[in-house]
């Protein structure tokens, strides 16, 4: 780590004329008055990783600002020029509702245009999946979205995409990182944009995108019968407001109820602790509105509208939140069952899930004789696989436990706009059968097995914390448990070593995925435990999945208690809490 003298010298280099007055003023104040803030802003460089940039906004090398963003964009530009020259290169840019997102998007556009690229810049905030669509529609070589997903208000970020509309993957990701690291001075950034190279896009692109979304509808005639089903939707101050209500209307829904306090885009997210549809607090106002209006479904999207949270009525009429696994299960079952009912199968269809997502999706796919693939966490791996099989197989849906879902191949990133529309359609289909979405979920459990998942995060901050996380992973890897909660470990998947060990057979097979620091333990009782360090935060994640038979939906509550107790016993046995 840098000494305080080195940090001060690094900060003083930001007082030069190449930095704007606002930046110089902020740095001077830190140098004069706030040593702690100064150290945090300059002790390291904000790293351009495989997912791009994400950090707290402000002056400094460890902050999101036009200079760190500029270095990333110039490095990406240099890589694009290496790959295909700068003649005829097109790029697309979108941004979310966050503070400075528009400013950062315009700065990115200026740098791309100064490098000779034709730039398609959305006129205002838009959902991330529409950026993926724009890259594909305009035949762009690359694209960028300015967003920090559901991080706190002080954060912003920068995600880079490639010409298929997916986030960059190997070999491009590491090669772009190499180019970004070569930009060692802000003087190497071409800030002076060429306005002739920047084209504003908006409503026409929205319509083209929504037309593709509409194609995923399977039962439009059922929606006509139940068009007035009351649905509450909240964008949680984010970009979803620009397209989700329009998508629902395009599908035929006529009774979409908003949450006025949250319909206004606001990077401060004033009505919630966190704009994360996984959090009950984020849906509190929407559920209140649903109770008042006797709505049947509540939907929420995160700030860049690529993740979806649902709340449905349970058997006593109380709204409960579905987790990402449950939403994926309902949507995949609906797609597969309706493909079968309408005789749409051609025999080459497949679905995708991540390795930490519920294996109930595999059971459902097997039940419909549909192929499934497991990929590492992150939708960039979905995009990579879809591209790989583009000419021979048909992707029809896929999801991950972290609330991302993509119901078609028209874009190559998770899409909460289309997922909201599909969830609403699924609710009308269930209603046509005399069921709620919750009752449909219970029916799925009865038929395929009751799977219950839980995620716990253990936070370990700073260098000491990072060392502890490494030691924990090394401990599980080098001395794996033989039993967990009195159930034998029968298989271990080590994605870092790319090896699957079948303990019962004593055989090893290769895991054909890129290396990733993930371990999985499969137990004799059907339990799956996945362990991985977070790629973006100082924590280690433990994913637990247990399952059992559900004899009938009336036994749901008592069976759920049994599964909850099993998860608690596993956590106790592993001494995690």
Task: List each model region and its residues.
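Conserved phosphate/anionic-ligand binding catalytic regions in large, soluble enzymes, centered on
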Residues: 42-62, 148-149, 231, 235-247, ...
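Phosphate-binding and adjacent anionic-ligand microenvironments
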Residues: 291, 295-297, 318, 338-339, ...
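An N-terminal, well-structured beta->alpha segment
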Residues: 2-108, 199-228, 239
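Gly/Ser/Thr-enriched, mixed-charge loops and adjacent short helices
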Residues: 14, 18, 35-42, 46, ...
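Short acidic, glycine/serine/threonine-rich loops at helix termini
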Residues: 102-107, 132-136, 154-160, 181, ...
């Amino acid at each position: 780590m840098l000494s305080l003298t080195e940090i001060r010298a690094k900060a003083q280099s930001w007082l030069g004329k190449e930095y704007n007055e606002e930046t110089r003023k902020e740095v001077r104040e830190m140098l004069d008055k706030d040593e702690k803030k100064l150290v945090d802003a300059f002790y390291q460089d904000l790293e351009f990783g495989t997912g791009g940039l994400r950090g707290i906004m402000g002056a400094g090398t460890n902050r999101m600002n036009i200079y760190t963003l500029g270095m990333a964009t110039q490095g990406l530009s240099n890589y694009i020029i290496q790959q295909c020259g700068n003649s005829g290169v097109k790029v697309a840019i979108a941004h979310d509702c966050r503070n400075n997102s528009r400013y950062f998007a315009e700065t990115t556009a200026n740098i791309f245009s100064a490098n000779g690229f034709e730039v398609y810049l959305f006129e205002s905030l838009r959902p991330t999946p529409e950026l993926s669509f724009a890259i594909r529609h305009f035949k762009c070589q690359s694209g960028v979205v300015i967003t920090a997903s559901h991080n706190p208000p002080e954060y912003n970020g920068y995600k880079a995409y490639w010409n298929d509309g997916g986030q960059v993957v190997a070999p491009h990701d590491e090669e772009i990182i190499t180019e970004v690291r070569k930009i060692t001075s802000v003087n190497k950034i071409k800030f002076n944009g060429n306005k002739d190279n920047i084209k504003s896009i908006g409503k026409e692109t929205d319509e083209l995108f929504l037309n593709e979304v509409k194609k995923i509808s399977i039962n439009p005639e059922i929606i006509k019968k139940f068009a007035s089903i009351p649905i509450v939707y909240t964008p949680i101050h984010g970009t979803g407001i620009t397209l989700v209500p329009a998508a629902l209307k395009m599908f035929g829904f006529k009774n979409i109820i908003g949450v006025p306090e949250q319909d206004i885009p606001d990077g401060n997210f004033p009505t919630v602790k966190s704009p994360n549809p996984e959090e009950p607090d984020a849906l509190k106002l929407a559920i209140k509105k649903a109770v008042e209006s006797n709505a049947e479904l509540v939907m929420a999207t995160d700030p860049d509208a690529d993740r979806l949270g649902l709340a449905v009525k349970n058997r006593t009429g109380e709204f409960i939140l579905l987790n990402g696994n449950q939403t994926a299960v309902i949507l995949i079952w609906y797609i597969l069952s309706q493909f079968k009912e309408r005789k749409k199968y051609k025999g080459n269809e497949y679905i995708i899930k991540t390795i930490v997502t519920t294996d109930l999706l595999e059971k459902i796919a097997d039940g419909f004789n549909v192929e499934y693939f497991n990929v590492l966490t992150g939708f960039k791996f979905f995009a990579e696989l879809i591209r790989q099989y583009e000419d021979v197989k048909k992707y029809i849906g896929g999801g991950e436990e972290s609330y991302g879902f993509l119901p078609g191949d028209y874009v190559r990133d998770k899409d909460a706009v289309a997922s909201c529309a599909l969830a609403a359609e699924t609710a009308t289909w269930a209603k046509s059968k005399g069921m709620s979405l919750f009752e449909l979920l219970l029916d799925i459990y009865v038929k395929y097995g009751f799977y219950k998942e839980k995620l716990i995060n253990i936070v370990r901050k700073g260098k000491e914390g990072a060392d502890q996380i490494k030691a924990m992973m090394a401990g599980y890897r080098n001395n794996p448990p033989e039993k967990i909660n009195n159930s034998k470990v029968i298989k271990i998947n080590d994605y870092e070593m790319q090896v699957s060990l079948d303990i019962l057979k004593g055989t090893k097979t290769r895991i054909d995925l890129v290396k990733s620091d993930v371990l999985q333990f499969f137990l004799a009782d059907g339990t799956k435990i996945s362990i991985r360090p977070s790629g973006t935060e100082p924590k280690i994640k433990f994913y637990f999945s247990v399952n059992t038979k559900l004899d009938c939906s009336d036994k749901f509550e008592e069976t759920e208690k049994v599964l909850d107790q099993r998860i608690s016993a596993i956590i106790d046995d592993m001494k995690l809490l």
